[in-house]
């Protein structure tokens, strides 16, 4: 709830329903607890995000509209904690490692999408990164202007790439004019 501020091992133990001593059965020290807990939490957030990701090309536009708000509501506090942890110089290398994995997983997802929507994964991957960045920024700061600006560029990009690669799956009905 409060990120790292005012959160000690006693509060963490209470939240986990155990004693402080029990925490150290699983973690060598507080740093390991923070690093491992953050990585686990964010892996669950990413799993939720990818579970909502479209598998049917016709769902892409709906996904672009709905997911930023869902992400903010469901995961905003978790994103703020992650950034608080991973931007500390002490944990920066762990953040870099986490995001390297994110890059690999989203690139793999883009490769899986390529045959379904007819756009090369090398084009899809940066679009995913822009989308995720916009979602995370909105989840952390609820900056509607930034979100809408990013979403408009993404939607236009998707339509342009669909036209370029002659894919009819994602075009809205009124975009065919």
What are these regions (language model features)?
Residues 9, 38-46:
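Short, basic, alpha-helical segments at the C-terminal edge of helix-turn-helix-like DNA-binding modules
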Residues 67-68, 82-86, 128-135:
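Short alpha-helical scaffolding segments that buttress acidic/His motifs in well-ordered protein cores
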Residues 100, 113-161, 165-177:
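Hydrophobic/aromatic-rich alpha-helical bundle segments in the mid-to-C-terminal region
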Residues 36, 49-74, 125-128, 151, ...:
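Hydrophobic alpha-helical connector segments
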Residues 27, 83-90:
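Short helix-capping/turn signature of helix-turn-helix
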Residues 1-32, 36:
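Helix-turn-helix
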Residues 45-46, 50, 74-77, 90-118, ...:
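Amphipathic alpha-helical packing segments from all-alpha helical-bundle domains
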Residues 8, 79-82, 94-97, 148, ...:
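Short, hydrophobic secondary-structure boundary micro-motifs
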């Amino acid at each position: 709830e409060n990120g790292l501020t005012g959160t000690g091992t006693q509060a963490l133990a209470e939240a986990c329903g155990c004693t402080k001593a029990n925490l150290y059965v699983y973690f060598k020290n507080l740093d390991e607890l923070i690093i491992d807990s953050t990585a686990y939490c964010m892996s669950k957030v990413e799993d939720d995000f990818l579970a909502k990701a479209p598998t049917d090309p016709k769902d892409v536009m709906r996904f672009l509209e709905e997911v930023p708000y869902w992400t903010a509501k469901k995961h905003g506090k978790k994103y703020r904690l992650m950034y608080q942890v991973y931007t500390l110089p002490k944990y920066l290398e762990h953040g870099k490692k986490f995001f390297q994995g994110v890059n690999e997983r989203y690139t793999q997802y883009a490769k899986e999408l390529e045959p379904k929507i007819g756009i090369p994964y090398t084009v899809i991957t940066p679009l995913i990164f822009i989308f995720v960045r916009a979602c995370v920024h909105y989840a952390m700061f609820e900056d509607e202007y930034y979100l809408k600006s990013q979403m408009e560029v993404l939607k236009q990009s998707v339509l342009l790439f669909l036209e370029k690669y002659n894919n009819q799956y994602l075009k809205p009905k009124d975009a065919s004019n």
